[in-house]
């Protein structure tokens, strides 16, 4: 079986007039450029003189990211450099020729990092268990190290709007916190700025765009590992919501940018203590507000007198 796949059309359609299809593709490309441009502007993702490392996995998302950034680079208000970087993790049957041939054809500066993380993951993770988490950490470390040693000022990843929404619910359901996958962040060690220019782009548009552009897609499961079950369940939930209530994912994505700390309950984000407190009032003593004194706590509650 070939290690390069073609993306199916998500919704099979009857044969269309080629001119209509061309117009739709043009509109889609224009929409993606606008959304990526808006994300870059809204979050200050790219500045004059930036050297941007575009992480290219061979999947539809990273191909789309690189393609749109190359288009924007030609007319961007500031000059910046793009370099495509792929990490060859030595997975079984990985088609090593695909990305170099594709990138050379584009005339894009690129580099292939060769690091056998697959053997490490295979040795550490028991057979049948999901490898994705450890694999992701090792991949991130390799990419961060390369970015540091080669002077990259930004690291661009291909996560899109739907990824960000799914991560929000993963953290909500499994970690009891309201957090997600930000469009821009500084790495934990403080050395790198990571950007996600596809933050406003929906996955279905990426599927259509990758199909139209005929990217040489490399599947992400060559290692044989299965998708994280929890993430898969969240993905199915969101797809069902979108099917039952079209536009729901977009509403959730917008809500993530409309946070009202005073309408939540995090005392580190909003000073509830000062809200409505008199100037002469002492700060409340939390211990004094516990359920009675120690003696009272062990006693039976009084029976109200009728």
Swiss-Prot record:
A motif (PP-loop motif) lies at residues 57-62. Signal peptide: none annotated. Its EC number is 2.8.1.-. Binds 1 [4Fe-4S] cluster per subunit. The cluster is chelated by three Cys residues, the fourth Fe has a free coordination site that may bind a sulfur atom transferred from the persulfide of IscS. Transmembrane segments: none annotated. Its cofactor is Mg(2+); [4Fe-4S] cluster. It is found in: Cytoplasm. [4Fe-4S] cluster binds at residues 132, 135, 223. Pathway: tRNA modification. Catalyzes the ATP-dependent 2-thiolation of cytidine in position 32 of tRNA, to form 2-thiocytidine (s(2)C32). The sulfur atoms are provided by the cysteine/cysteine desulfurase (IscS) system. HAMAP family: TtcA. This is tRNA-cytidine(32) 2-sulfurtransferase. The lineage of its organism: Bacteria, Pseudomonadati, Pseudomonadota, Gammaproteobacteria, Lysobacterales.
């Amino acid at each position: 079986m070939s290690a390069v796949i073609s993306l199916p059309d998500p919704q099979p359609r009857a044969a269309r007039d080629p001119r209509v299809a061309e117009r739709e593709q043009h509109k889609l490309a224009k929409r993606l450029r606008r959304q990526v441009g808006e994300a870059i502007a809204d979050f200050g993702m790219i500045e004059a003189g930036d050297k941007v490392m575009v992480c290219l996995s061979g999947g539809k998302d990273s191909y789309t990211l690189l393609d749109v950034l190359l288009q924007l680079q030609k007319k961007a208000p500031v000059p910046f450099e793009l370099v495509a970087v792929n990490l060859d993790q030595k997975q079984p049957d990985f088609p090593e020729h695909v990305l170099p041939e594709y990138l050379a054809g584009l005339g894009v500066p690129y580099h292939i990092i060769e690091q056998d993380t697959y053997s490490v993951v295979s040795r550490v993770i028991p057979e049948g268990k999901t490898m994705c988490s450890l694999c992701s950490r090792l991949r991130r470390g390799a990419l961060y190290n390369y970015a540091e040693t080669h002077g990259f000022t930004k690291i661009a990843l291909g996560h899109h709007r739907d990824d960000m929404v799914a991560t929000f619910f993963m953290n909500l359901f499994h970690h009891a916190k309201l957090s997600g996958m930000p469009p821009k962040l500084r790495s934990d060690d403080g050395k790198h700025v990571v950007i996600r220019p596809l933050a406003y782009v929906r996955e279905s548009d990426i599927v259509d765009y990758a199909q139209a552009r005929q990217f040489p897609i490399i599947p992400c499961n060559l290692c044989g590992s299965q998708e994280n079950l929890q993430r898969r369940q969240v993905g199915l939930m969101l797809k069902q919501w979108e099917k039952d209530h079209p536009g729901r994912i977009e509403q959730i994505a917008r809500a993530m940018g409309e946070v009202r700390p005073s309408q939540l309950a995090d005392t580190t984000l909003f000073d509830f203590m000062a809200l409505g407190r008199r100037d002469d009032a002492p700060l409340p003593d939390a211990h004094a507000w516990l359920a009675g004194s120690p003696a009272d706590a062990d006693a039976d509650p009084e029976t109200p007198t009728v």
